[in-house]
Amino acid sequence: MKLLSRDTRLVCELALCPLALVFWSILGVRALDNGLARTPTMGWLHWERFMCNLDCQEEPDACISEQLFMQMAELMVSDGWRDAGYDYLCIDDCWMAPERDSKGRLQADPQRFPSGIKHLANYVHSKGLKLGIYADVGNKTCAGFPGSFGSYDIDAQTFADWGVDLLKFDGCHCDSVVSLENGYKYMALALNRTGRSIVYSCEWPLYLRPFHKPNYTDIQYYCNHWRNFDDVYDSWESIKNILSWTVVYQKEIVEVAGPGSWNDPDMLVIGNFGLSWDQQVTQMALWAIMAAPLLMSNDLRQISSQAKALLQNKDVIAINQDPLGKQGYCFRKENHIEVWERPLSNLAWAVAVRNLQEIGGPCPYTIQISSLGRGLACNPGCIITQLLPEKVHLGFYEWTLTLKTRVNPSGTVLFRLER
């Protein structure tokens, strides 16, 4: 099936009455304030792995259906994903029927979701999980299903009535900047008015940046997390592009991240087909450093034990979920090596050394301990543990010493430093 590009934007005009505009001006900075996502969201999202597969006759195990999500829910419990922290099961595009119902409400495709979304939400909740769903700010979703333009209130209430816990709100089919921004703000208010706690995942800056620089202070008022860059694909080139974009724009985005508000570099594709082992380690390590939502998109029925162990690595997850809530950043790039760091609670730090080369063998690299954590991480000394690609207790290092490591091509070594 040929999908409409997520970059496709058709005209949608949002006609807001003066009263609504006054309402926004009063409540704008408190529009979200939902107390959710105090640490980055963790879970599973169908899009990258299963896309918009609607053919349940030919591919019953891979089409977007309630069967797929119920199977994933079962595995998230039985295989330890929920206990590791992955507690959101998220539906992306292509779950809807082609038309709204007679009352103007969104409805699930009756053949692929015969029991409806409320039933699925109840099932997911019975497993101790939470359900995420997808909608779009414009006239249509990216795949051409009904959009939420003009129906923000009724859609928000529908999701609340169903028991939805997260909304991923896309930005296709809306090429008016005013419409785009107002639509995202209005949906935040509409979700709050339902009285239900619903994590709000936006793609606002992704669609805004081609027109002007996003106001991230504004965006963080309304969204729990937000996409900045292109969709991730199951390829190393895609991961590299996301990381390169992040380094270029980190001065804009790092400071606005924190409890309840996160930059989202998109899904984890670990356990699929396109990344080598070292590249999977790099994605896991850098997503932890970036305090990114950890939303896997893979097939939990077929995932390898090695990929599962990486995704469930409790030490790496602890860095990602650190309650201090500070996003990490790249602070050094020399030749083909990048060094990233992230401040953690209790004066700890995470440090990642990434090898940009894709040829040759492991690259030796030496770090001055005094340079880490803005000179504070190991002053006067610290205990260093290598967490990835394997856990190694390296011991106590004084501030005046050096740390030597070797990093595989396209790989990353992740350390934790504790005072």
Swiss-Prot record:
Homodimer. SUPFAM superfamilies: (Trans)glycosidases, Glycosyl hydrolase domain. This is Alpha-galactosidase A. Disulfide bonds join C52-C94, C56-C63, C142-C172, C202-C223, C378-C382. It comes from the Eukaryota. Galactosylgalactosylglucosylceramidase activity is stimulated by saposin B and ammonium chloride. It is found in: Lysosome. It catalyses: Hydrolysis of terminal, non-reducing alpha-D-galactose residues in alpha-D-galactosides, including galactose oligosaccharides, galactomannans and galactolipids; a globoside Gb3Cer (d18:1(4E)) + H2O = a beta-D-Gal-(1->4)-beta-D-Glc-(1<->1)-Cer(d18:1(4E)) + D-galactose; a globoside Gb3Cer + H2O = a beta-D-galactosyl-(1->4)-beta-D-glucosyl-(1<->1)-ceramide + D-galactose. Belongs to the glycosyl hydrolase 27 family. Gene3D superfamilies: Aldolase class I (3.20.20.70), Golgi alpha-mannosidase II (2.60.40.1180). Its EC number is 3.2.1.22. The active site is at D170, D231. GO terms for cellular component: cytoplasm; extracellular region; extracellular space; Golgi apparatus; lysosome; membrane. The keyword Lipid metabolism applies. Pfam families: Melibiase_2, Melibiase_2_C. The modification Phosphotyrosine is found at Y186. Glycans are attached at N139, N192, N215. It is an enzyme of class 3 (hydrolase).
